[in-house]
Amino acid sequence: MEQLHLLLASGGGSKASTTITPFCLARDHASTSSPSPAAVAAPAPPPEATSGSEQSIHGSGTGLQSSEAMIKAKIMSHPLYPSLLRAFVDCKKVGAPPEVVGRLSSLAVVTDVPQYSGDRCLPAQQPAADPELDQFMETYCYMLTRYGQELARPIQEAEEFFRGIEEQIDSLALDEDVSYDYEDEVAGGLPEKSAAFGENEVTTTTRRHLMNKYSGYLNSLWTEISNKKKNSTGHLPRDARHKLLQWWHLHYRWPYPSEAEKAALAESTGLDKKQVTNWFINQRKRHWKPKPAAAMDAGFLQMHPRYGASSSSSPAAALRVEDGGGRRSAYHPRGGP
């Protein structure tokens, strides 16, 4: 538009100053007559023409400014202008510092006033309906709204991710507090100085100090507990096992110790009565094979010849004699008691 005004202004000045000769007439005139320096040189424009061109340029600039002001007035007087400005401010808020967000929010509140005083566009001065302007405002409102949503989505996802990480860290910190409390209870509790503080006031440095202080005691206690577990699973000490084997070899024919014998073995070996009982049960299952009744009777008579002339030829009678007659033996050979 400005170039059009300039072209019109320059055209008017040239008509007022000189007369343009067509190219064909100028060529015929040059062939018939010799050119003169005054005719070749273009005459200087008069001062009136120069001042007229400057006035036309100034007038074109003023016209452009007035057209821009008119377009601004149309946009700001449009009903969708507050929505357009609010969408633009929302885009500016994404990722901005809190103080900047506050200023932008206050600006959006000011622009929500029906009569916006940017160029003092009153309702009486509102232009007529413009379908092209309506489409422009609707399109850019939609575009700015979508753009603000796309800008805010990564920030929202990042905030959700950080919240999840913080929750995991808090849960780990709670588990660590519980573990430290358990270890402190095993070690005998906190010292008197640290017991005065609350659980939340115990720092990580204090916990590390306590762990370093009681770590040796905890390790020795754990070793002792592990050894007791091993012993309770059947791994008896060597001396105790040796004494039990001695009794086993001496009573191999009938390796069933009585309750009194179990108590004596438990006292001599340092084991529990239950451990002694379990050891004999396992030993009989693995290493004891009872002999037939006839072989046992013959072997018994050979080992105890004084019972051979007894009035009763049954080994059961001999066993009853050996037990003192008042208590029956647990062994009953073939033939019944």
From Swiss-Prot:
Residues 309-318 have a biased composition (Low complexity). Pfam families: ELK (PF03789), Homeobox_KN (PF05920), KNOX1 (PF03790), KNOX2 (PF03791). One of its GO terms (molecular function) is DNA-binding transcription factor activity, RNA polymerase II-specific. Its main location: nucleus. Gene3D superfamilies: Homeodomain-like (1.10.10.60). Keywords: DNA-binding, Homeobox, Nucleus. Residues 228-291 bind DNA. PROSITE patterns: ELK (PS51213), HOMEOBOX_1 (PS00027), HOMEOBOX_2 (PS50071). Transmembrane segments: none annotated. GO terms for cellular component: nucleus. It comes from the Eukaryota. Residues 205-225 form the ELK domain. The keyword Nucleus applies. Residues 34-63, 307-337 are annotated as: Disordered. It is found in: Nucleus. Belongs to the TALE/KNOX homeobox family. This is Putative homeobox protein knotted-1-like 5.
